[in-house]
UniProtKB/Swiss-Prot annotation:
Annotated residues for binding of substrate: N79, H80, D123, K165, K168, H196
GO biological process, one term: lipid A biosynthetic process
Organism (species): Blochmanniella floridana
GO molecular function, one term: UDP-2,3-diacylglucosamine hydrolase activity
Membrane topology: Peripheral membrane protein
HAMAP family named in the record: LpxH (MF_00575)
Protein purpose: Hydrolyzes the pyrophosphate bond of UDP-2,3-diacylglucosamine to yield 2,3-diacylglucosamine 1-phosphate (lipid X) and UMP by catalyzing the attack of water at the alpha-P atom. Involved in the biosynthesis of lipid A, a phosphorylated glycolipid that anchors the lipopolysaccharide to the outer membrane of the cell.
Gene3D superfamilies linked to this entry: 3.60.21.10
Domain of life: Bacteria
Full protein name: UDP-2,3-diacylglucosamine hydrolase
Record key words, sorted: Cell inner membrane, Cell membrane, Hydrolase, Lipid A biosynthesis, Lipid biosynthesis, Lipid metabolism, Manganese, Membrane, Metal-binding
Chain residues that bind Mn(2+) 2: D41, N79, H115, H196
EC numbers: 3.6.1.54
Length: 247
């Protein structure tokens, strides 16, 4: 059996094919897994656990099915769904994890997992914005507002961000290699898995003749799904892409 890792599904009502493909993934591939880790941005936007539409309930039912099959599902918040809280997580039978987590494989190896936005340290303006948005007091005030007001604020912010992105350097989305190495050394790990950049790949980082690391970047779900697998018996790592309409 394998441990599965996904990120950046970006579920929303305007993309029913992705919703359908994700549900197929849950009811088929994920059912056979040892565990499923969702590393953020499962949803395109999350304005609070009280916003429960048909899509949210359908996804919750799909995630509940994993729990019924005794397949644990873990969730790390991303930059699109950082307001997803314990109420919805409990509804889905998901286990919320902190922004970064260290997994210990049966072999004893450590694996660092996170969404990935905190690795883009060259994007100073985003990191300042992230720190601001993750202020607990600010989040409490925002979540106390009527849902209609939260939606209005979100739409205004999104309009600004779309205009701002036109002037952003693409390199700001790149991961700082030294940040990755420092995190791996700190956590006594040689494997790091993340999403966020939408640039799927397995990067081998050779430090010296005897020291090397792996960085696995998960892809965005669009026409294809993206999942990383770790075989619990031999620690083999694969990054798989599959058409969402042919599962």
């Amino acid at each position: 059996m394998s441990i599965l890792f996904i990120a950046d599904v970006h579920l929303c009502n305007t993309k029913p094919k992705i919703i359908h493909g994700f549900l197929n993934f849950l009811y088929n591939h994920a059912m056979q897994a040892q565990a499923l880790y969702i590393l953020g941005d499962l949803f395109e936007v999350w304005l609070g656990d009280d916003e429960k539409n048909i899509m949210h309930m359908t996804i919750a039912k799909g995630l509940q099915s994993l729990h019924k099959k005794k397949v644990p599902c873990y969730f790390i918040r991303g930059n699109h769904d950082f307001l997803l809280g314990p109420k919805y997580a409990n509804l889905c039978d998901m286990i919320l994890l902190p922004d970064s987590q260290v997994l210990k494989l049966p072999s004893g190896k450590n694996v660092v997992i996170l969404h990935g936005d905190t690795l883009c340290i060259d994007d100073k303006s985003y990191q300042r914005l992230r720190n601001f948005l993750h202020c607990q007091i600010l989040q409490k005030i925002f979540l106390s507002l009527p849902l209609s007001m939260r939606l209005y604020i979100f739409n205004c912010a999104r309009t600004f961000c779309i205009k701002y992105k036109k002037y952003k350097l693409k390199q700001n989305l790149h991961i700082k290699l030294q940040t990755v190495i420092d995190m791996l050394i700190k956590n006594q790990s040689k494997i790091l898995i993340h999403g966020h950049t939408h640039q799927p790949a397995i990067h081998n980082i050779q430090i010296s003749e005897n020291i090397s690391f792996k960085r696995i970047v998960l892809g965005q779900w669009n026409k294809y799904g993206s999942v990383a697998t770790i075989n619990e018996k031999n620690d083999d790592i694969n990054l798989i892409h599959f058409p969402l309409n042919k599962q």
